[in-house]
From Swiss-Prot:
Function: May be involved in the transport of sugars to the developing embryo in the fruit. May also be involved in signaling events.
Molecular function as annotated in GO: hormone activity
Keywords: Carbohydrate metabolism, Glucose metabolism, Sugar transport, Transport
InterPro entries documented for this protein: Insulin, Insulin-like
Expressing tissues: Expressed in seed coats and pods.
GO terms of biological process kind: glucose homeostasis; glucose metabolic process; positive regulation of protein secretion
Coiled coil, from the record: none
Protein name per its UniProtKB record: Insulin-like protein
Organism expressing this protein natively: Vigna unguiculata
Family that this chain belongs to: Belongs to the insulin family.
GO cellular component, as recorded: extracellular space
Taxonomy, superkingdom: Eukaryota
């Protein structure tokens, strides 16, 4: 898994992969779309959204 632009279902899949059973949260003001879809995101950045 390399750093890449993630949006839509690809972003959700990556969050499930990274967060696992902990799940993840989404709040529109958190900037997940801007961070992951508009620019390259790392696994570490995605893990910040895991519960």
């Amino acid at each position: 898994f390399v750093n890449q632009h993630l949006x839509g279902s690809h972003l959700v899949e990556a969050l499930y992969l990274v967060x696992g059973e902990r799940g993840f949260f989404y709040t529109p003001k958190a900037g997940i779309v801007e961070q992951x879809x508009a620019s390259v995101x790392s696994l570490y950045q995605l893990e910040n959204y895991x519960n």
